[in-house]
């Protein structure tokens, strides 16, 4: 909202399949469904604006990264701002999820459901904090797809906002992907956030103190790219 207001831009939020509902719905997600969601969102963006700026967080960043290497999947995108992009989770054994019997092994080790405690009312309201562990399989598959993507041929300028203290995803891979990125790019490491995991590094729920600063950083970057 803050970025769109500052740029006087139209704004469209997309909701990836399975998200924003109850825990059971999370199992409905798939890599193909999320790619379709992304392409639909870009089509809407092209319809309501002259240029499309993508702001992608966490596994949304995985999706935007893969799409940036597929010309037909990122047509019309002028820039991408990544916030804590997911190029590999830190959870031990995550790579087993996409192996044969990955779902069965995950359920045997961790149970059929995953959950985490919420930290405040906004966290409780806007996060799905209990869901089938099977819902993590497409997340891992998309993460692997993004990490293996030939980002050297990316032509879309990118801004990577992340924390080296991220306890959820691997910041070393963010630095690696940025180093391989074929188009102009910038790294914005963030040290102090409100999130104890240093993953949700902006937003009223977990990191309100950094929201304004990071929104302004994105605005300055976009204006420099677009000559505003």
Show which residues each predicted segment covers.
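Conserved alpha/beta-hydrolase
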Residues: 4-22
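Catalytic active-site module of serine/aspartate enzymes centered on a nucleophile-bearing elbow/loop
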Residues: 194-228
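Short alpha-helix in the alpha/beta-hydrolase fold that links the catalytic acid
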Residues: 156, 169-180
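Short beta-strand/loop motif that positions the catalytic acidic residue
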Residues: 154, 160-162, 166
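Active-site nucleophile loop of the alpha/beta-hydrolase fold
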Residues: 81-92
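Active-site nucleophile elbow and catalytic-triad environment of alpha/beta-hydrolase enzymes
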Residues: 133-150
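Gly/Ala-rich beta-loop-alpha elbow adjacent to hydrolase catalytic centers
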Residues: 55-64
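Catalytic nucleophile-loop/oxyanion-hole region of alpha/beta-hydrolase
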Residues: 21-48, 53
């Amino acid at each position: 909202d803050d970025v769109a207001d500052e740029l006087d831009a139209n704004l469209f939020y997309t909701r990836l399949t399975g998200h924003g509902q109850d825990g059971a719905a999370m199992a409905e997600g798939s890599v193909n469904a999320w790619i379709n969601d992304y392409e639909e969102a870009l089509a809407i963006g092209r319809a309501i604006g002259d240029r499309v700026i993508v702001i992608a967080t966490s596994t949304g960043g995985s999706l935007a990264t893969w799409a940036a290497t597929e010309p037909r999947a990122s047509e019309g995108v002028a820039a991408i701002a990544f916030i804590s992009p997911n190029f590999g989770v830190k959870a031990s054994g995550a790579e087993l999820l996409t192996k044969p019997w990955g779902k069965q092994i995950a359920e045997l080790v961790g149970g059929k459901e995953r959950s985490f405690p919420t930290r405040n009312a906004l966290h409780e309201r806007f996060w799905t904090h209990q869901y089938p562990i099977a819902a993590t399989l497409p997340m891992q598959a998309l993460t692997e797809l993004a990490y293996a993507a030939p980002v050297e041929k990316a032509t879309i300028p990118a801004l990577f906002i992340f924390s080296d203290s991220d306890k959820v995803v691997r910041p070393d891979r963010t630095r690696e992907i940025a180093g391989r990125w074929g188009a102009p790019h910038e790294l914005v490491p963030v040290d102090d956030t409100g999130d104890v995991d240093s993953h949700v590094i902006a937003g009223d729920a977990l990191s309100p103190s950094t929201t304004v600063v990071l929104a302004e950083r994105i605005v300055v970057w976009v204006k420099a790219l677009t000559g505003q």
